[in-house]
Amino acid sequence: MSDPATKPFLAHRDLWLLALCQGLFLTNNVVFIAINGLVGLSLAPAAWMATLPVTGYVVGGALAAGPVARLQARLGRRRCFQIGLLVAIASAAVCAFAAAQQNFWLLVGATLVAGFYNANAALYRFAGPELVPPQYKERAISWVLAGGVIGAVAGPNLASATRDWFVVPFAGAYLCLVGVALLSLLAMSLIRFPAPPAPKTGASTGRPLSEIARQPVFIVAVLCAALGYGVMNLLMAATPIAMQMCSHPFDRAALVLEWHVLGMFVPSFFTGHLIRRFGVLPVAGVGVVLNLACIAVALSGVDLMQFLVALFLLGVGWNFLYIAGTTLLTEAYRPEEKNRAQGAMDFCVFATMALTSFGSGALVTTQGWTWLNLGSLLPMAAVAAGLAWLATQRKTQVA
């Protein structure tokens, strides 16, 4: 058997399978984003509640982030990931039933439960580096996230193609997600994750989370990932509703989301290389600039191309910030601290997404698309300030 340390990067079969699982996870997420707000708008007691099914998925992820981290420490990566996929199968079936029954609150409850899958799959990016030698760490994170290209193509097209399968719009899309999760469950069963190290008697369990979280690198990592994801989610979740309010048909909204998700994940094929060559902070800085460019384009008008270009730039900006944040986080913890540090970051990400997914529906239906974009400037300013602070800290340490 060949030594894994000497194998070429692309020869690691398990990494490819994990990237496939990531792609199927993003297929699920893109379908949820594309249809949950519209289904919610048709069922909700009030228009401002339209994105509650999207919010439920994110809140479920936030609530599950801590338990999932502990479950992974106890059961290992694969078994915990498989449990998450079983939850995905069950919750997608309940979503289809809720849509058929025109039951808004059952739909919200089903997406809340589906958040357990969301929290599990969010850890795929951390599991990737464990499947390859240390010198491939940044590339492994990027390539796992690059699997999302599958979701970029499959998700919008699946949502559009299955919209009218049944009398109830989009019930067929939810049922298709059952099959997507089953395929992911099969791929997950073939991945050989390294066994977690056996606990040693008297061995250190690492620093408390409060100490880990006080590090500048941890703070900025969370700022990049959480606020980058928050702004992306704020604008993405509102896009189908905003386009419908601007009289664009659903197939155009699906096209915009397809290009948005391509922007999110196609750069993953080279983001890791950019980080190794130019450094993590410059790449994150470019992510901030791309987000600002997105806002500028979005504010310039509401034609199809303006939505498409803005959401594409938003996707690329998210990619740079998210991968940079994830890479920074790996500098903030020791091996025995990984579950609590990763769980803390993902809790912050999900909590931010919960606020923005709910806020997107309320803001776009009451204040409009323009104010939604203007509100995105403040989080980006906070990320830029954090990056400048960490860069100053590192220059001081070198001096």
Task: Identify the function of each model-found stretch.
Residues 1-12, 193-222:
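Juxtamembrane intracellular "pre-TM" segments in multi-pass secondary transporters
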Residues 23, 104-119, 306-320:
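Hydrophobic core of transmembrane alpha-helices in multi-pass small-molecule transporters
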Residues 36, 118-132, 320-333:
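Intracellular juxtamembrane helix-capping segments at the cytosolic ends
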Residues 64-77, 266-280, 364:
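Helix-to-loop junctions at the C-terminal end of transmembrane segments
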Residues 86-101, 290-302:
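C-terminal ends and interior cores of transmembrane alpha-helices
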Residues 110-147:
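Cytoplasmic helix-loop-helix junction between adjacent transmembrane helices
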Residues 139-157, 348-356:
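Glycine-rich segments within core transmembrane alpha-helices of 12-TM secondary carriers
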Residues 160, 178-199, 386-391:
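C-terminal membrane-cytosol helix-exit motif in multi-pass small-molecule transporters
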